[in-house]
Structure formats: C-alpha cells, structure tokens
Amino acid sequence: HSHDHGSADHLAIEGFTSLSFSSSQPFDLRAFQNFLDNHLPESVFRAKGILWFKESERRHVFHLAGKRFSIDDSDWKGARKNQLVLIGRDLDHDQLRHQLQDCVVVSVD
C-alpha cells in the first residue's frame, strides 16, 4: 500500500507567501485603485502598508483583509516612500511586483 507523506494541512500552509514591495517614487492614485479593483488576485487575503500617492501630501496607512480594505491618512514622519506587504496563497510574485511597479509614477523631470 502507498501513503502520502505530505498531509493536506502541511501543503496548505506552505502555499502561503508574502510579497514585499517598496518604491521611493509615489503611486498614482487612480492606477493603484484600478489595481485593487481589477487586478488584485483572489488569493491575496491580507495586505498592509504605508502608501504615498502623488495626489496627496498625506501618509496613507493601508489595511486589507479579504475583500475589505481601509486607508487612513496621517502626517509623514521621515522620508516618503511606499512600503506594502501582500499575504496570500500561491502568489505570482513577479506578476504582482510588475503590476505594482506599473502604479508607480515615473518622474517626468
């Protein structure tokens, strides 16, 4: 008889990954909203971070759980930057990083 050494629970836990993203340029607010609304995979169940939007002078604290998210603003202390962590199952890190990078404003100096 054969038995499987990998229990389902074990595999489920291993499937969870976290992706960190940071940038020293701000996000475009519309692009980021579009990412959340249309491109965020179902498999992302938790996200949090500090967001910098070019449209705002404020620092934005972002929390996502399931399909619900909140963004609270406050004053910046220190250098402005984006720092975001996504947690989910079997995430395509390269694709997500690419999509987030697409939300970053490229400076037009």
Predicted feature locations:
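C-terminal accessory "lid"/substrate-recognition subdomains
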Residues: 1-77, 82, 89-109
